[in-house]
Every structure is written in C-alpha cells, then in structure tokens.
Swiss-Prot record:
Positions with a binding annotation for ATP: K270
Protein residues bound to Zn(2+): C27, C210, H235, E239
SUPFAM superfamilies named among the record's database cross-references: Anticodon-binding domain of a subclass of class I aminoacyl-tRNA synthetases, Nucleotidylyl transferase
Catalysed transformations (reactions): tRNA(Cys) + L-cysteine + ATP = L-cysteinyl-tRNA(Cys) + AMP + diphosphate
Main location class: cytoplasm
EC number(s) on file: 6.1.1.16
Family stated for the protein in its record: Belongs to the class-I aminoacyl-tRNA synthetase family.
Alphabetized PANTHER family for the sequence: CYSTEINE--TRNA LIGASE, CYTOPLASMIC, CYSTEINYL-TRNA SYNTHETASE
Motif residue range(s): 'KMSKS' region: 267-271
Recorded GO MF terms: ATP binding; cysteine-tRNA ligase activity; zinc ion binding
Name listed for the protein in its UniProt record: Cysteine--tRNA ligase
HAMAP family hit by this protein: Cys_tRNA_synth
Amino acid sequence: MKIYNTYSRQLEDFQPIEPGKVKMYVCGPTVYNYIHVGNARSVVAFDLVRKYLEFRGFEVEYISNFTDVDDKIIKAAVSENISTKELSERYIAAFYEDTDLLNVKRASQNPKATEFIEAMIDFIQELLDKDYAYISEGDVYFRVAKSKNYAKLANKNLADLLAGASGRTDEETNLKESPADFALWKSVKADEVSWQAPWGAGRPGWHIECSVMSTSLLGETIDIHGGGADLEFPHHTNEIAQSEAKTGQKFVNYWMHNGFVNVDGEKMSKSLGNFTTVHELLQVVDPQILRFFLATTHYRRPLNFTDDALTEAENNIKKIENAYRHLDDQAESNLSALTTFRNDFVAAMDEDFNIANGMTVFYDFVSWVNKGNGGAEVKAFFDQVLEILGIKFEIEQSLDSEIEAMIEARQLAREVRDFAKSDEIRDALKAQGIVLEDTKDGVRWHRE
C-alpha cells in the first residue's frame, strides 16, 4: 500500500509504527457554526481512508478533535449573548447529527481543546524551558528561527516567509522577536474565557491544541495526520515545529491533505460567503447522495459542487442499488471473475486510496452482477465496497413481498391480455416510486 506524503511530495510505502495497527489524527471543526460541504469533504475523505484501512485488516485508532475555544467562537457567543461552552456544545451536537446522516463512523475519540488546557500549559512550559518559546507581555510565542526545516511541509522556506511578513505593523507583530513567530498562548482580553498559567491568564493558540491532543492520545509519533490542504500552512507546519521541538522525535510519518470543494472555480469557505451548510443541504438532498458525491472523487483532487454533480451521484446510486436489490445470494457464479474484481479494486485503492479508479472497477462489477451473477461471496464483496463508500441500502422485506405480489398480479393480467389491469398495476407501483423493467429474465423493479 502506498500513500502520497505531503511532506515528501511523493508516494511512499505505508509502514505503520506498530504492525497491524494505525494511529490516525484528523483535524476537526472549529465549532462556531454548522459544517459546510467543504468541511464535510475532509470528514468523508478520511472516513473512507479509515474504512479502507480496516477493510485491509488494520486496527485503526482514529482521533478527530473539536476546537471549542477560538476567536470565532468567542465572537459568535458574544453576538448571541451566550457562553462559549453553550455555543460550542450546540454545534458539536449538530456535527454529530450531520455526520451520522452521512454515515461517518464515529471517531475512537473526539477530544475537545478545553479538556486539555492543563496539558497545553505543561507543553508550553517545556518549550519555554528549552528556549523554543518566549513570553512577551503575557503572550507566549514560538521561536520559528530555532526550528529545523520549518515550513518544509508547505514547500516554503523561512526567508520567503520573513520577507512576506516584513511590512506588517499590527500590534501582535510588534510583540514578536520575528514576524514569523506564532502564538502558543494569548493573554486574556476583557470578558474573554481564560485559564490561569504561570505566565498569566489567557488561552491557548490554535496550533498548540492539536499538538497536545494528538500526542496525548496517540503518542509522540503518529502514523497518519490528515486535514484539508488549507491547513498545510500555517497550522500543520506549526504543529510539526512545536511538537518536534518538545519531543525531539518525528511528529508524523505520513501527512495527508484533501483537496478543496469549489464553487464557480473558488474554494468553498465561510470567509468568501459561498458556502452551503450540510445541515441546510440535507433538508433537500438525500444524505446518501451527498455522501456518494463527496466519497467517490480521489481525496487529493478538487471537487466541484454543482447540481449536475449531485444528480450524477443520485443516478449512480440508483444503478448500484438496483443491482444490489436483485443480487441472488444463492446463485452460482464464476468466482475467478470475482477474484479479479476484488484484486483490481484493492490494487486501485492501495495506490493512495484512489477511489476514482476503484469505482471504475466497481461499476464493472455492478454490470457483471446485473447479468445474473451472484452468490454469497459476491454479496459479501458488494457489502464490503458499500461499507467503504459509506452507502447503505435498506432492504424492506415486507414491502418487497408486497411489490412482488403486485408484479405477479400484473404478469397474470398480461398473460390473459388484460392490459388495462396490467397498466393499472404499473401505474399504482409508479405512484409508490417503483419502476418496472421487463427483461428476458422476467420483470425487475427499482425505486425512482
């Protein structure tokens, strides 16, 4: 199995630290609003990665955090005249509601930043003791100049970053030894939530939160760290700098970053105002359709959010569901063909989780099933791929029996040339969203 490592900019053989086990951390949402489709892309992309690793036999410890203390949360809470805790808890609940509908497997743990404040203070103190950090008027900053290979992850160099920051005159920059230094701790402002630290009251910076939560729960070195491409710099870059400064160990072995969701050629984001929340979209779009749309493009490629793309996803799901509903798990099939499908699917997915190539194989498999191939092993592979994709088809046996009875009655009407009765039954089924398809092997049905 190979993974494209953002740090090295190349495909690398995947070798977990502990054979058979994967320690995986994915940056979660800042909980001040509903997640939008771009946020959901990251959630679904790494859910698919996790599920495929489990399909391949790995035991995955999957951690994804909630940032529940942040400038945006404070601002939103003030505007509603509620506490930051009340606001963040509301949107954590909404996150679970949305992602459950998208059939995202719950993380092994979802730590909240506010649960690790004491550990963050200890982490910062170690950086101060090692002279990687300094205090400036109650704030604590990281000395970027002491970090080896700083910004290699983002393919940048420190000289360029310093040149780009040289014209800044904001208040925070004046507190720093260097414009590139970043905040580990922010001193308390009036009426803000804060915690007491040896250097004064305040709250942690954004970057320190993920370093502390990930290393506290997974250890000093992690197998896989994921997130959106926009997190390469500065967030993940700063995570590397501060984590490796503290531990002296490599922080992450494989960095993975998903591409953006674009709207009219621009990244979907709250700052641009071109976003659609998952909460509002799922009022009008079936969760399976959104899940399929997000899951079936290779995670590193950009994804264009359009009505046509959602319609295509819906049509593809219908084709897959139709094959699944009519798969006879008692039938006999050429198992060598099944082995070829399985091997080809694994070969595609083993190449950096290339679901696009995997879907090409899967669509060929679906066509093969539609030709009458079936059996228990065929159904088992079908179920495995659906699990990786995060798609579930509810087979309602009582309703299916009723439909089959109506189809049988229609067939009897056709045999006695009672076409009026036949058409009446067809129309009744269509009114229930059931479409009949006459084939040489008999009548099939599927949902509209």
